[in-house]
Amino acid sequence: MERPHPSSIPTTPGVYLYKDSQGRIIYVGKARNLRKRVLSYFRDGLVITPKTKAMMNHANLLETISTNTEKEALLLEASLIKKHRPRYNIVLRDDKQYLLFRIQKGIPFPRLEIVRQSYKDNAVYFGPFTSGTSVRDTWKFIHKIFPLRRCSDKVFNNRIRPCLYFYLQQCLAPCTEEVDPKDYAVLIQKVELFLSGKSKELVELLQKDMLYASEALEFEKAATLRDQIQAIKHTIERQSVVLPEGGDMDVIGIAVVNNGLALGFLFVREGKLLDGRTFFWPGLELDDGPELLGSFLSQFYSPISSIPPRIIVPWLPESTNNKDEISEDTFETLKYVLEDIRNSTVRIEVPKNIIESNLVDIAVTNAREAVQTKLGEPMSAKLAKVFHTDKPIFRIECVDVSHISGTNTRVGMVVFEDSQPLKNDYRIYSTTEDNSPFIKGDDYAALASWAKRRIQSGPPWADLVLIDGGKGQINAVQRVFNEHHLKDVFILAGIAKARNEEGRVDRRAGNIGDKIFVVGRMNPLTLKEGSPELLFLQYVRDTAHNFVLGKHRKARKNTALLGELLRIPGIGQATAKLLWSHFKTVEAMTCATIKDLEAIPGIGEAKARMLAERLQSLRNQ
């Protein structure tokens, strides 16, 4: 790529995008001064990392986006990296949100919820946690010793008698006012102490309550409190205290492992090591460490994150003009962004004492051991060998078609990155939306319709597009891709199901009868029976099949319910549309109360009573 003329680049803060010859974004960067940063790439004698050198060799086009401040540039950079996943950026591949406990404030009888997002609402959050199993086990443990309500708000507001948990002495039945709000508030206070890690204060409080109960001759209550104390003490014994003085912080360690960089992340809350996580980026060197650290922090934390007051990092960057390093100015900007999210002070700093240094060492050790344990040859490299390509097959988009006797045709697409499902990118396509009446029962036309709409969505493109089908299906898709000059952007393949002697589909895992067809190849690929590559491709195919089938069943159920609605006297198309637009799902509609129905404009009290009765009968069918 030729050096751009300085006058073509603004001197404002902003984001710059390098694109390849096909227009794909291959790198996104941010700068306080766009002209100064971009021109630095073309300075003679500049020492750059191999990754940056490779990026410049592939770059064909430069675009810039100006922002008002460097903070805005940092946020835009993180957003573009998450959206486009450029090849030469350090991308945080794990987009899933961590789990949190949530307790709503301002209501008399809140429940303990498990959520993936936190908001600036009238609630308190505890976490984060990475393991769904451990979170659910903790939730069960809390309900076992603290009898909170478990039901949803809708069930709670409509219950007229206590549930089974009340009779098992695992719920105080606030739904039927069996407990005073003040007593329930005390219970919530104890749960908050437990989740905050303040177990010592909680035990002292319970011991006082037990003493008062004994003095009042309430021996059954005292026995319950005794059991709670014993259960909590047993839990405390298993917790690892890493900060004797307490405190909340996240700790990061970075290690060079197996020709790549591994990052270990520890969650420390109330002085206790709550949880941990490891990440790995192959192909990075130690010189990429500063960029990795800055990219990770800007992508990992978001407006729905749980951000502690301190983030301990292995090093802080020095002020530098080398564009391959993240400068202290960038860290300062990142600090301001995190403080805006947290609405309080955030310090990004190196360890201050031997205890914190040891925590960084633990994070490094965890990262190194996790990578060495899990890392054989990655599946992306194995699949590259299967499909005879030099480029690792990192992103896979798999497509399947479902219909019933040619009606309600749906095309489902699932996405895998780094061998993991990327559920936020799953999509369902209703092929009737492009006004193609000939599609009924025609899988080829449905797939062609999907291909057109997938192209309209744009990048990020897959390394492998996998179709649930054979040569006919992949040829239908290939024609569309060729028309839009996308022939060489990705590999297009089909996986055809094996069939038994009776001609029926045989879905046995690893079955060698499953054939994998590739565009441009006459014969199917030969994969060893039961090989990891074949098992993985079958798993991806089956995931797509189950996804579209589940959506199709839901659509059929909704269609059936619509027919039932129209058969109810007094309900026409207009009322049916009102119900659909208000409730969105079958479950919500059939659980609607008279009060819920009356709230819909155009439905009066008499009609609401009639609808509630009929919808209830539909739910019981």
Swiss-Prot record:
The name this protein goes by in its record: UvrABC system protein C
Gene: uvrC
Record's keyword terms, sorted: Cytoplasm, DNA damage, DNA excision, DNA repair, Excision nuclease, SOS response
One GO term (biological process): SOS response
Organism annotation: Lawsonia intracellularis (strain PHE/MN1-00)
A GO cellular component annotation in the UniProt record: cytoplasm
Gene3D superfamilies linked: 5' to 3' exonuclease, C-terminal subdomain (1.10.150.20), GIY-YIG endonuclease (3.40.1440.10), UVR domain (4.10.860.10), UvrC, RNAse H endonuclease domain (3.30.420.340)
PANTHER family tied to this protein: UVRABC SYSTEM PROTEIN C, UVRC/OXIDOREDUCTASE
The keyword DNA damage is annotated on this UniProt entry: yes
SUPFAM superfamilies xref list: C-terminal UvrC-binding domain of UvrB, GIY-YIG endonuclease, RuvA domain 2-like
Domain GIY-YIG as annotated: residue spans: 11-90
Top-level taxon in the UniProt lineage: Bacteria
